[in-house]
Design a protein with these regions (language model features):
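Short alpha-helical elements
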Residues: 1-272
Length: 272
């Protein structure tokens, strides 16, 4: 997209990475109809919603699209896995530039309210039982988000460990057959479960999980502070502060796009 129309909201160069991942629009067999809104315009509008937290109906007139067009295209692209693939592509570029630190990975979660309910919501133990969800994040040693996930607020953190770590290890470029694996995993006492420690050792991943009632959280926390910063980066995208989407796939899509933006900004800052 370069320094184009939407450079005020879309980081330079991001559209060029995203464009090949966008599924083609369906063509009416009978022809006719109105001309499709350009994909890059919709892409910019989606990022605006993520950053500002506004409702689809509150999109500024400068985008020149209706709320139904923007939301419909967002749902189609989310179903096609565009946001996860965009995040993955940027993570690979970071790896190619030797900007990922896999000497350790850090895992944590954060609660978000989900007033509209829907799948993957439940009574939040930290919000007086109100409906909520959790965002789960696995980062590298520098806090770059590698894998993101969503669960109900009443699901125990430990249940996310295997899916998050397995998702990290199976993210690979099919043309290179390359797998990423951290040397050690840092997490707080919520993940202190014997069978998870055994599972990690079976994967040849060092276990640095705080033990309940034994190890000081302050000592191990020296390595885990980066994930708190990562959560701050992600929740800086206002659409993530409250889950408005009843469909968890759509909330996960916004979370994946936010993770992609965090990683892309680091890539640009360290390579230009």
């Amino acid at each position: 997209m370069g320094r184009g129309t939407w450079s005020w909201i879309v980081p330079d160069g991001l559209w060029e990475i995203a464009e090949p991942l966008i599924p083609p629009s369906k063509v009416r067999p009978q022809g006719g109809g109105t001309q499709d809104t350009p994909d890059e315009t919709v892409f910019a509008a989606i990022i605006y919603v993520l950053v500002s937290g506004c409702a689809w109906r509150a999109l500024p007139p400068c985008f020149g699209i209706s709320k139904s067009t923007a939301h419909r295209r967002f749902v189609i692209w989310s179903r096609a896995g565009v946001w996860g693939r965009l995040h993955e592509e940027i993570v690979h570029r970071l790896y190619d530039a030797s900007l990922l630190d896999l000497s350790r990975a850090v895992l944590d979660s954060a609660h978000v309210r989900a007033g509209k309910g829907g799948e993957h919501t439940g009574p939040s133990p930290v919000d007086r039982g109100k409906p909520g969800s959790k965002m789960h994040v696995l980062s590298d040693a520098n806090g770059l988000p590698l894998v993101v996930g969503v669960s109900a607020a009443n699901v125990h953190d430990s249940l996310a460990l295997k899916p998050m770590v397995a998702g990290h290890q199976t993210r690979h470029d099919p043309h290179r057959g390359r797998h990423f694996k951290p040397q050690r995993l840092h997490a707080d006492k919520a993940y202190d479960v014997p069978h998870l420690r055994k599972w990690l050792r079976g994967k040849r991943i060092g276990v640095r999980i705080a033990r309940k009632g034994i190890e000081s959280s302050e000592r191990l926390g020296r390595r885990r502070w980066v994930i708190e910063r990562t959560m701050s980066w992600l929740t800086g995208y206002r659409r993530l502060n409250h889950r408005y989407e009843r469909n968890p796939r759509n909330y996960l899509a916004f979370l994946g796009l936010a993770a992609a933006l965090c990683c892309y900004k680091r890539l640009v800052r360290l390579t230009t």
